[in-house]
């Protein structure tokens, strides 16, 4: 409603998502626009309500490059001892929460080769860079809500 008279448009193909322990992008989604999404909110659900706006076309595409990663829930065995140690160190500190290559290099002290080899396993989920038209501006706003028995609580206010 507040966007009607603005030069900015809501990005139509991005949505909010359910939050669960160690899983920031869980099963249920929170649409910004009316959709055929039939996810039903239940008591105890925690959700990130995200709105992205742009002065571009209001449609995002995924690039083929990722800068954010997360360990998958079901880790396959890793033979290389350095990569296995790296994977274990990430899991000990981050579980399945997102992280960057810079975190691995600067905070954990591993090499680019170790991280490259970890990326070659099936144990990393990649979050691709989201693209709009070149030169456009994008902004994001997010609130977290909790569905209680009788009401919805906005936890980020």
What are these model-derived regions, one by one?
Residues 1-157:
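Active-site neighborhoods and metal-handling regions in enzymes and metal-associated proteins
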């Amino acid at each position: 409603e507040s966007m009607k008279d603005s030069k900015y448009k809501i990005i139509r193909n991005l949505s909010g998502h359910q939050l669960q322990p160690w899983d920031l992008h869980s099963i249920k989604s929170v649409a910004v626009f009316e959709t055929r999404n039939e996810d039903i909110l239940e008591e105890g659900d925690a959700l990130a309500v995200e709105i992205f706006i742009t002065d571009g076309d209001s449609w995002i595409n995924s690039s083929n490059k990722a800068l954010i990663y997360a360990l998958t829930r079901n880790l396959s065995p890793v033979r290389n001892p350095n990569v296995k140690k790296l994977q274990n160190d990430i899991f000990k500190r981050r579980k399945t929460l997102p992280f960057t290559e810079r975190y691995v290099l600067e905070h954990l002290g591993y090499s680019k080769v170790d991280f490259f080899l970890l990326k070659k396993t099936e144990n990393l989920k990649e979050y691709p860079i989201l693209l709009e038209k070149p030169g456009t501006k994008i902004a994001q706003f997010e609130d977290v809500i909790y569905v209680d028995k009788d009401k919805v609580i906005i936890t980020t206010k």
